[in-house]
């Protein structure tokens, strides 16, 4: 069944919980205490400018977005696009790009190189030159690259057949799959690498943690197994199908197609539409800001969580008109008058540029300009 699901996803896209867990009623109290200040902050408001093929994008289906100083990179269905000085430059297979469909992007802050995960290999853009890595010419585990993350001299890659790591100093590749890690399935949808920990988002196999110092792998599962009903809400990872992961300030933010999770190394706190401000449990991507704040990209809009309150930004699901709503800790939802919204409700990528936000959607790229 999972293989059938995976095939569908490719077409559309081009064990126990670790550590002791307290009762659900207490599991998120430390998180609430840390987030007390967030309750007094106004939720961000934006004026959205949208980019489509009408104003320079090579394709309206945008899988990923990356902020690189004043440059904005967009991975689309039909090439890699970079926006600089109010103009777009497009890279495609004729320029050396591995494949026209660019699923993921990462920046090497040391060198300025941009890494692009595609449907047929991994490409590096460096000073206008593109080098491509595939199963045939490198140690890449699979040519379908869902995620990429750079940590110092290491490039971590999430693929349809496990994960791998390229050491840029030695040129050596290391492969990680069901043979040398606890993953039950090998479809790795996302990776978040830092000097201390690396996290893998695995389709059907939960969340994997790699300790950079000890070389040890740990695995975090949904205590409900593959049951779509949530029996133990804050007892562990919300679901086995993990689509995205973000590790920031020693906090893990995980996205699944059945809700979201936050983990501080001891306590879990899960997010479901029935008891929070998420517009949908179907989460494509997640981007942590810090220990308390995160952005969620769902199939029904862009959502922001400040540790207590929620905001949702989207075209209305019924009228298509720009819409923003705010939800407080008591569950009160308040509409906010706005005149702009992200290009589409189906959000696939998120990145930040100062106080602004860039959003990759199924129908265009959006720039949210923070308003006072």
Feature locations, PLM:
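Sec-dependent N-terminal signal peptides
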Residues: 4-13
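Carboxylate-rich, polar loop motifs that coordinate divalent cations or form catalytic acidic clusters
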Residues: 19-372
